[in-house]
Amino acid sequence: MSIEEEMGRSSRELPVPTISRITSLSQANATLSHCWSRLWIPGRHPTDENEQAQERQQLRIWLENWEKAFTDFLCSSMASMGGEDLTQCRVLKANHLTCTILASDVGPDATPQDFDGFEADFQAIVELAEAVLHARQRTISPQSASTGSTASPVDSAPPVGSLDIQAPLYIVMARCSNAGVWDRASRLSLQSRGL
């Protein structure tokens, strides 16, 4: 990549924000969303393998700092959180685990078996997604009963621009070699879309 291309690429991207403290779920969502975009957007990664490895290493360090700040935030705020906030915390944790998997040293041409070391993370993502869908179903069930409608978890999905559980479930299905975990992720993905 030429200097001009590198300058053009870097001038269009905001740096991943420094994170030492999280003060709200909105901040946690916004900062993790930015990290997601660095990992997820096709074609934005450096073409040089050394640059890719260096960027993934920087993101792994950032994700460790985010997790520590998020854990500190939960310790100080969780007792006063309502059900919707707790659901959002689960969504954020599922996305954090997913970012950690994507930022790993496993290369872009990896097979699902190359991700076997993340099986506990895949399992945790599925369990978090189940809890999110269960909470959303409980939230909409009283409304459905009173109106006679048939609502699905997608009816109470987060606002556009917020992280949700679809992308983490997709990564489980794309990267997990455990058929049982894959099957649960697939069913939850369909359920979360109301299918």
Give a label for each model feature.
Residues S2-C176:
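Cytosolic regulatory protein-protein interaction regions
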Residues S177-W182:
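Structural helix-adjacent loops and short alpha-helical linkers that scaffold large soluble proteins
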Residues S189-G194:
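TPR/TPR-like (Sel1-like) alpha-helical repeat modules
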